[in-house]
Amino acid sequence: MLRTARFLQRSISATSRPNCIVQPQRTSATCPRSFILQHTEATSDPLTPEIRLRLLTPRCDFWRQKPELWPYGDPYWAIYWPGGQALSRFLLDNPQIVRGGRVLDLGCGCGAAAIAAWMGGASYVLANDIDPVAGEAFRLNCELNNMKPLDFQAENLIGRETGPWSLIVLGDMFYDAELADLLCDWLRRSIRSHGTKVLIGDPGRAQFSSHPVLRHLQPLAQYSLSDSTKEENYGLTDSTVWSFEP
């Protein structure tokens, strides 16, 4: 699994986040919940010590196993990506942004930002990811933080009619120009239709930094990444939270 974990980190760090289309599951026999409990570690990152997550770490057996032995699609949910770290820290430090509101964590992965939003007092939080295994990981992460599991939806919401969200958060999602264009159009419609606020977390990867969306972003906060996150993400040192204001 070391090769898989390193591949995922390298793909996001050097150029982009990997393709969001998860590989088909290789088996239906394994119970995701039991598998995640057995093959991940409950840990916390120095940037957000308030939140504990089940992640793939160097101490996990699959970190060094052959990737083909992994029974599910690529485990993007098992890594705490830098954009998500920055978003989570920002929400924890600024609970007034979520308090009493309806929050969508788009492409949630491990669900840290959704958990941070709930900790900040959001009235409703929906975590969304196209990988259903991410949903099981998210539920376990909620339990790990002594929370009743929040709602999770395993569908591609981009391009669909959005609900009246007060806040949409997304981290590490600007990894492909075509997807970024679709995201921007969809987020604009939500802002204009519902007055939704949009926060984006990204550590400054190439696709994000060169995309026209930067003209419509206002930086809100920048955070230094932990030494381990820097090492795993090939030279990225900081992660920024932006407000999307088209």
Swiss-Prot record:
Molecular function terms, GO-annotated: protein-lysine N-methyltransferase activity
Cysteine pairings via disulfide bonds: none
Gene3D superfamilies: Vaccinia Virus protein VP39
GO CC terms in record: mitochondrial matrix
Reactions listed under catalytic activity: L-lysyl-[protein] + 3 S-adenosyl-L-methionine = N(6),N(6),N(6)-trimethyl-L-lysyl-[protein] + 3 S-adenosyl-L-homocysteine + 3 H(+)
Major enzyme class: transferase
Family statement: Belongs to the methyltransferase superfamily. ETFBKMT family.
Function: Protein-lysine methyltransferase that selectively trimethylates the flavoprotein ETFB in mitochondria. Thereby, may negatively regulate the function of ETFB in electron transfer from Acyl-CoA dehydrogenases to the main respiratory chain.
PANTHER family cross-referenced by the UniProt entry: ELECTRON TRANSFER FLAVOPROTEIN BETA SUBUNIT LYSINE METHYLTRANSFERASE
Protein name according to UniProt: Electron transfer flavoprotein beta subunit lysine methyltransferase
Organism in which the protein naturally occurs: Xenopus laevis (African clawed frog)
